[in-house]
């Protein structure tokens, strides 16, 4: 399975009236349903990124591992799926989320295999013998739990000479948890005490969940930081949260926008620790009218803020997408808007009745998409981040990346807000912003 598809931007053509909503520089297949990113890993001169993918919008179809590679985390090439369900095998109904590691120079995947009718997804492993383009047969490496609300999404890493595996879990009695296993050889695994546990807490509109999906473990400034996706049987996906596992958990949101879930970590990269995430649709299912849904976020460098929350910034190579200054009276669907400093309001006028408003105060950023779309199925609402700016950081007050229906805003203090917007009016659009604002068109 080494045949490649065309590069992402060449696969994003549409003759429909919503062509301007299709992201061009974010990772996504030309059609079908995409969700969780999986197993980013540097191998040779490239980074490999896998992701949950279905070839159509049929959510009952078995999940495959889509595959993309990049030399710089910005210019991506899509390939054929690297992993597909094995008929009659331990993943016959879906290859669900996990991660990858290097095992004697080969890429080894750990993931959840789904079989219809079984209460849990089994933790499986499979090896690639062709540089990550495809994976061989899978087998189970840890037993299914006796009882749990949920058990899935392994994350494997090496630390202090040993291999460790975190698995998302939850129980009725003890709440959400990260199950933990140890191995000397990636083959034989022994269960140890959970890495973290937390009874479900709900306050101020935030919910830590009754179980945790997609656990990731980073080491930042000598501290072990878990990144989890909160989940509950009645509510489904919640928020992406982070916390120090060596003190009583105090989860904090990783992204303060409306559309970010199922983060996937790369512990070590040329830019330090990184996170990717799934940017789900911000519109009801009847609005998925162009044959695709779901996008992978931009890769994010991460560090710890003064309050121990996880902060984010775009990778430096994002600058290579800049194709020249954009006129504020003729903004395209792919652009970067930069406010170097100060307060004010950034308004992207899509049409007479459609606009996206971003307000900057001394300490907060607010994104209001209440009037961003006249489409009946598009979501609205406002999102806010406090403690948003750090003038001493050397970073702009805010960098706003627009890619069709995707908006990702990064502030100087490392706050990030991701959302989706669906203007019915195609570009060119008009930008109203403070006088010092810079704007670039972005092109692959």
Each language-model region and where it sits:
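Repeated scaffold domains used in trafficking and secretory/extracellular systems
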Residues: 215, 259-264
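Short, solvent-exposed beta-strand-to-loop segments that form ligand-recognition rims
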Residues: 414-428
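Beta-strand-rich interaction surfaces with strong enrichment in secreted/lumenal proteins
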Residues: 143, 251-253, 326-329, 384-391, ...
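Short, aromatic/His-centered strand-loop micro-motif at the edge of beta-sheets
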Residues: 373-397
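Ligand-recognition surfaces built from glycine- and aromatic
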Residues: 426-444
């Amino acid at each position: 399975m080494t045949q490649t598809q065309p590069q992402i931007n060449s696969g994003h053509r549409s003759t429909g009236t919503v062509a301007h909503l299709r992201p061009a520089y974010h990772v996504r297949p030309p059609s079908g349903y995409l969700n969780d990113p999986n197993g980013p890993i540097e191998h040779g001169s490239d980074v490999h990124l896998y992701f949950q993918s279905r070839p159509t919008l049929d959510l009952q179809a078995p999940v495959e591992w889509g595959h993309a590679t990049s030399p710089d985390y910005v210019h991506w090439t899509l390939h054929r799926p690297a992993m597909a369900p094995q008929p009659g095998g331990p993943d016959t109904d879906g290859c669900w989320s996990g991660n990858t590691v290097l095992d004697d120079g080969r890429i080894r995947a750990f993931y959840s295999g789904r079989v219809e009718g079984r209460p849990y997804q089994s933790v499986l492993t499979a090896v690639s013998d062709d540089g990550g383009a495809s994976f061989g047969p899978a087998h189970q490496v840890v037993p299914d739990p006796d009882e749990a609300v949920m058990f899935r999404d392994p994350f494997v890493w090496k630390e202090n000479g040993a291999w460790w595996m975190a698995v998302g879990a939850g129980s009725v009695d003890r709440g959400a948890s990260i199950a933990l296993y140890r191995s000397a050889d990636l083959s034989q695994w022994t269960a140890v005490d959970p890495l973290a546990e937390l009874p479900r807490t709900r306050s101020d509109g935030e919910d830590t969940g009754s179980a945790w999906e997609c656990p990731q473990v980073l080491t930042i400034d000598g501290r072990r930081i878990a990144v989890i996706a909160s989940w509950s049987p009645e509510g489904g996906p919640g928020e992406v949260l982070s916390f120090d596992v060596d003190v009583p958990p105090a989860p904090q949101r990783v992204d303060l926008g409306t559309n970010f879930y199922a983060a996937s970590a790369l512990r070590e990269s040329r830019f330090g620790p990184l996170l990717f995430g799934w940017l789900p649709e911000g519109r009801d299912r009847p609005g998925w009218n162009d044959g695709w849904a779901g996008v992978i976020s931009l890769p994010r460098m991460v560090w710890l803020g003064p309050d121990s929350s996880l902060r984010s910034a775009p990778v430096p190579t994002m600058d290579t997408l800049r194709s020249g200054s954009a006129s504020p009276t003729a903004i395209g669907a792919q652009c970067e808007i930069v406010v170097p400093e100060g307060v004010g309001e950034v308004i992207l006028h899509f049409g007479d009745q459609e606009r996206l408003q971003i307000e900057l105060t001394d300490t907060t950023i607010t994104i209001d998409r209440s009037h961003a779309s006249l489409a009946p199925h598009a979501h609205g609402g406002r999102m806010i981040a406090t403690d948003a700016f750090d003038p001493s950081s050397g970073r702009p007050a805010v960098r706003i990346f627009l890619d069709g229906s995707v908006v990702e805003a990064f502030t100087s203090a490392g706050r990030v807000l991701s959302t989706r917007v669906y203007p019915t009016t195609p570009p060119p659009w008009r930008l109203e912003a403070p006088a010092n604002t810079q704007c670039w068109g972005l092109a692959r």
